[in-house]
């Protein structure tokens, strides 16, 4: 690298990192502001403004052509802008939902919002990586922030225990991930994704080295997206973490990790040798997620197993290995982010002080829709969309990941996916039934912990849930424009070799 041209190149490429620069810079400003007053009311709104401005920037770049920046370590273009948009909007919704929640717990510290911003920066880097080093840096930046966010409520033993489990298992999975990268580098002699695909794997030993490394690499990714059999951490961590941040963890993390995985599959291993392996993991993930969710009485654990199942549905789209499958997965990531952040947002508003209030069993929430009809109505929309009920976005999302798999000859995989999706109707509709049709008096004898009044939600937080519910209807009816956009990425962006 010529040092005389390196600095001008970095300056030229800086606009491509607009979102990372703005979000990261505001995160630093939050820490400085927090040093003077740790509960400054302007801190979360600084985050909302930064994420909102960055989201608008990404919308204007959805039609941008593919390119690479920062010495070909990061990608730009419509594909990256779409993923960044999901991540930024999810982060924005998380802050709006966290404000009343953290105020109630008296944990509205500036560093919490700063960590959300830094975590978002890591996710953006992960979703735009064109190099294995960039993938690792983005993944670890995201992960370290999530470890802290999971357990920052120090008085809550469940949260601290969840954070410790997440950290230990996350560090363990990172070892597999790094070793996989090392083996792939040893086989190809490069860290750049397109160069890996172009490398000669002429001998049997070289091929074994590469595919062995790729298998270990996938283990690390499957851990991050809660795919079976690397999902065991998910229910405990989701249950113990602060509820709005659980929603962030379950949505934005998946968006960034699946985006990086798509880029690796498209650029580094464009052949179809991996399809059956990914399909097998998809089957295991769908079956375990849905079957285990049937027995759950804690709503957050139920949503955790639901999150595992939806990772399986996304893997069905990737298993097709086609442009339509990848485009369907992108659409599904958008829909999944909306309905899951909404579901966890509702649960955060139905949580009251004390251990009993944080348990959130189904029985403790019986008839809550009668007291909070807006929350009950939006939760109903989110549950129906998670089932895949038309005309909501979840139905279109599942169709768009299942149809390419059928076209790719994986009909057996789609049959399993449809059966598991039908099975999920039981536990999702059970939530709707408890919210709307079961009286609190019916369970008073067995669950006397029911609070007389739930925390008052802010207008911004309630508005966020309503917007999410309306967005699911819009995405289910007027999905053509979004689908056309995502298909275009794989004709001009992700499938193209960037210069």
From Swiss-Prot:
Keyword Cell cycle carried by entry: no
Its biological purpose: NDH-1 shuttles electrons from NADH, via FMN and iron-sulfur (Fe-S) centers, to quinones in the respiratory chain. The immediate electron acceptor for the enzyme in this species is believed to be a menaquinone. Couples the redox reaction to proton translocation (for every two electrons transferred, four hydrogen ions are translocated across the cytoplasmic membrane), and thus conserves the redox energy in a proton gradient.
Family listed: Belongs to the complex I subunit 2 family.
EC number: 7.1.1.-
GO MF term list: NADH dehydrogenase (ubiquinone) activity; NADH:ubiquinone reductase (non-electrogenic) activity; quinone binding
Protein name per its UniProtKB record: NADH-quinone oxidoreductase subunit N
Any one annotated GO CC term: plasma membrane
NCBIfam families xrefs: NDH_I_N
Regions crossing the membrane: 16-36, 42-62, 77-97, 109-129, 133-153, 167-187, 208-228, 252-272, 274-294, 302-322, 327-347, 376-396, 411-433, 463-483
Annotated compartments: Cell inner membrane
Gene Ontology BP annotations: ATP synthesis coupled electron transport
UniProt keyword annotation of Transmembrane helix present: yes
HAMAP family per UniProt: NDH1_NuoN_1
Subunit structure: NDH-1 is composed of 14 different subunits. Subunits NuoA, H, J, K, L, M, N constitute the membrane sector of the complex.
Keyword entries, A-Z: Cell inner membrane, Cell membrane, Membrane, NAD, Quinone, Translocase, Transmembrane, Transmembrane helix, Transport
Origin species: Salinibacter ruber (strain DSM 13855 / M31)
Highest taxon, organism lineage: Bacteria
Stored Pfam families: Proton_antipo_M
Membrane-related topology note: Multi-pass membrane protein
Gene: nuoN
Catalysed reactions, semicolon-separated: a quinone + NADH + 5 H(+)(in) = a quinol + NAD(+) + 4 H(+)(out)
